[in-house]
């Protein structure tokens, strides 16, 4: 996908950038693979905000994506590359030879007419899904399972890829996009290639309204709030907040480690890169 810049006819258009969508071959989604999901606005079942700065946005239908790739041994033809409003990556519509249709995340260099397959005997080419045990070292992979049969959970964003760096015992060592090297069971499935739409991270939204179309509400600084709303709020005139930066609940930010999941620490060979 190339990046298209707009003419500066207004302040909002001056720095705005769009994708060209030349890889999209089908405009309307497959009816059998969509469903309507009610928006939560960042609230949980109790009605409390658990994820701030969410709400509004354009109406959208959820595409049912096959992250498990459990239809093994049956080849499928790529019928279309489609836009998905729920993610940065594109979707590939697969038509299996037995008549079933499924969506998968479209990797780089996957085009209409290509044949893809999943299973231990599949070839090493973009779009094919295999157990890590059957993938050569150094291969770029995405949509990686962390638990056997649960479906891909990591490396699914636009332009991302992981790399298989080692195999030892019943585990494989996978280098994730963050730089973290993690142990994953060799029986877990992964898809070959890099996730498509690589230029997605380079797009400039250009104006606040476009952020609202995506369902993202404004983020307000703590020092601009009142003391009742934030630990750094209040003060006469502008202030520094009077303490180290923190969240609205007093948790330190700016590099403070919050990871508490000690049960999975043993699977991390190397921690992620510092920002």
Swiss-Prot record:
Subunit relationships: Part of the 50S ribosomal subunit. Forms a bridge to the 30S subunit in the 70S ribosome.
GO cellular component, one term: large ribosomal subunit
Keyword Coiled coil applies: no
Xref: NCBIfam families: rplB_bact (TIGR01171)
The protein's name in its UniProt record: Large ribosomal subunit protein uL2
Family membership noted in the UniProt record: Belongs to the universal ribosomal protein uL2 family.
Region (Disordered): 222-275
Key words, A-Z: Ribonucleoprotein, Ribosomal protein, RNA-binding, rRNA-binding
SUPFAM superfamilies on file: Nucleic acid-binding proteins, Translation proteins SH3-like domain
GO molecular-function terms, A-Z: rRNA binding; structural constituent of ribosome; transferase activity
Function description: One of the primary rRNA binding proteins. Required for association of the 30S and 50S subunits to form the 70S ribosome, for tRNA binding and peptide bond formation. It has been suggested to have peptidyltransferase activity; this is somewhat controversial. Makes several contacts with the 16S rRNA in the 70S ribosome.
PROSITE patterns: RIBOSOMAL_L2 (PS00467)
Pfam families from the UniProt entry: Ribosomal_L2, Ribosomal_L2_C
InterPro entries: NA-bd_OB-fold, Rib_uL2_dom2, Ribosomal_uL2, Ribosomal_uL2_bac/org-type, Ribosomal_uL2_C, Ribosomal_uL2_CS, Ribosomal_uL2_dom3, Ribosomal_uL2_RNA-bd_dom
Gene name as annotated: rplB
Gene Ontology annotations of biological process type: cytoplasmic translation
Gene3D superfamilies: 2.30.30.30, Nucleic acid-binding proteins (2.40.50.140), Ribosomal protein L2, domain 3 (4.10.950.10)
């Amino acid at each position: 996908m190339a990046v298209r810049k707009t003419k500066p006819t207004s302040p909002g258009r001056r720095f705005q950038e769009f994708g060209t969508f030349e890889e999209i071959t089908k405009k309307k989604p497959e009816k059998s693979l969509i469903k309507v999901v009610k928006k939560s606005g960042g609230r949980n079942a109790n009605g409390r905000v658990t994820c701030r700065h969410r709400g509004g946005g354009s109406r959208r239908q959820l595409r049912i994506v096959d992250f498990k790739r459990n239809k093994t041994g049956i080849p499928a033809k790529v019928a279309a590359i489609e836009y998905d409003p729920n993610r940065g990556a594109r979707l590939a519509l697969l038509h299996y030879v037995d008549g079933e249709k499924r969506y998968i995340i479209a990797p780089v260099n996957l085009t209409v007419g290509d044949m893809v397959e999943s299973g231990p005997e599949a070839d090493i080419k973009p779009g094919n899904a295999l157990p890590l045990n059957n993938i050569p070292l150094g291969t770029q992979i995405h949509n990686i399972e962390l638990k056997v049969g649960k479906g891909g959970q990591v490396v699914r964003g636009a332009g991302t890829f992981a790399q298989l760096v080692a195999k030892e015992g019943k585990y494989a060592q996978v280098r994730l996009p963050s730089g973290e090297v993690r142990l994953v069971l060799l029986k877990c499935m992964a898809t070959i290639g890099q996730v498509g739409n690589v230029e997605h991270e380079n797009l400039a939204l250009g104006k606040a309204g476009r952020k609202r179309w995506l369902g993202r509400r404004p983020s307000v600084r703590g020092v601009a709030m009142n003391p009742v709303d934030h630990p750094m709020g209040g003060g006469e005139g502008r202030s520094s907040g009077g303490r180290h930066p923190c969240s609205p609940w007093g948790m330190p930010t700016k590099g403070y480690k919050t990871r508490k999941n000690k049960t999975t620490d043993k699977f991390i060979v190397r921690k992620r890169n510092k920002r």
